[in-house]
Amino acid sequence: LIRSPEQAEAQLQEGTQDFVCLGRPQIADPNWANKALTGEGTIKRCICCLNCIESMQNNAYIGSHGECSVNPLVGHENMPLPKNGDGRTVVVIGAGPAGLCAAELLADRGFDVSLYEKKERVGGQINLAAAPPDKAKTDWFTQDAAAACLEKGVKIFTGKELSISEIKEIKPYVIILATGSAPVKPRFGGNYNPEDVYTFEDILTGRISLEGKNI
């Protein structure tokens, strides 16, 4: 899989291949070739999650299109994208995948976008998804989405939790609430200690260690 223009060019120069053909990278970023040619803009990398393959297999039975975890516009390329922001202020609260994608899309439409994240790092639960072994490429989504937002003028504030009074002072045209979800601990039958039920966040953040335990 070709990861970058630099990799493609290096393999051409080495004689490893005579030409380069892109599959999934072009789905993740349809402007891959143009960005490689001009050197402008962040190329959004395929994170090798195979959602494209799985979704095309599943959706074929219902006559629908494939999907891409990196590019939410796959299958919606003809959807109108009105440039009607006119510099109006939009506040996006939460810089997980939804918040990052919303901020970039709104900036494309001409809005003045400010993105707020109460944690010190953007990415939301993607940061947890990238934590297990061999899942580091998942973090490419966060890196590339944040870079694209900054390129398009989105102002990103981390470690900042907005109060209602602060929002009123900003007087935004629209507020996008993208604060994510909270994990639920299901109830089980039989005898068990509820305190022994942990969420994926407990484990992946290292708050709870299960080494040497029966799971």
Whereabouts are the PLM-identified features?
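Beta1-alpha1 glycine-rich phosphate/pyrophosphate-binding loop at the start
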Residues: 92-158
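Short beta-strand and adjacent tight-turn residues that come in two discontinuous sequence segments
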Residues: 21-22, 159, 177
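Short, contiguous acidic/charged loop-to-helix segments that flank catalytic cores in large enzymes
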Residues: 81-88, 128-140, 199-207
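C-terminal structured "cap/appendage" subdomains that terminate the fold
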Residues: 9-19, 26, 136, 145-146, ...
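Flavin-dependent oxidoreductase catalytic cores
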Residues: 1-93, 97, 101-108, 112-113, ...
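A conserved short coil-to-beta-strand element within the FAD-binding core of flavoproteins
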Residues: 158-169, 185
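Glycine-/small-residue-rich beta->alpha transition segments that form the dinucleotide
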Residues: 172-174, 178-185
